[in-house]
Amino acid sequence: MAPASSEEDLRPSKPKVIYVMGAGRSGSTILGVALGNCDGIFFAGELDKWLPRAGEPTRKDAARVAFWERVRARMGDPEILVGARPRRYLERSSALFRVDRLRALARLRAPYREATSELFAAIAATAGADYVVDSSHYPLRAHELQSLAEIELYLVLLVRSPQSVIASFAKDDVAERRFSPVTTRA
C-alpha cells in the first residue's frame, strides 16, 4: 500500500457531522465547545447562519476571518442561496405552513443540498477534522441533512426544561437578542 501523499488523503471522504438539536439556550454551545476540544472534532457553531451571512464570521479576529476565507475558497459559488430564503423555506419549522412557496422550495432544495455538502467537506478539510459539529438546532435542517449522501450524520437532541429556556432569554449577560417572559408567553 502506498503512503498517503498528504494529510487530507488520510481523512475519510465523507465528513462526519454531529448535528445538535434542541431549544436555543439548551446547552448546545457548551456541548459544542467541549466536543471541539477533542482531537479530530471541529465546532463550527450554528451553520444555518453561514449562507445568510455569505460565509462571513460575526467576529472579525484575523484567525477566524482567515479560516472562513479558506473554507469559502474550497466551495463553489452558492450565490442563489445567499440570504435568508433557504433558511426560511427549508430549515425553519414555519416552512411547513408555507404551501404558497412550494415552487421556491423545490427550486432551492438541490443547490441548498449541494452547497451544504460542500460546506461540511470544506470545513472538515480546512480544519483537518473528521467531525464537524453544527449546533443550528432546527429539526427541518436535520431532515435536510439526513438526505445528504456526502456526509455521515449523527443527531444529538438536547433537552432542557421549558421554564429554564424561557428564563435564560431574560438574562442580560448574553450577547444575543433578549426576550422578556411576556414576549415568550411564559
What annotation goes with each model-predicted range?
Residues 29-41:
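A conserved segment at the C-terminal end of the G1
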Residues 20-32:
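Glycine-rich phosphate-binding P-loop
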Residues 13, 24, 109-112, 134-138:
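Aromatic-acidic/polar surface patches that form glycan- and anion
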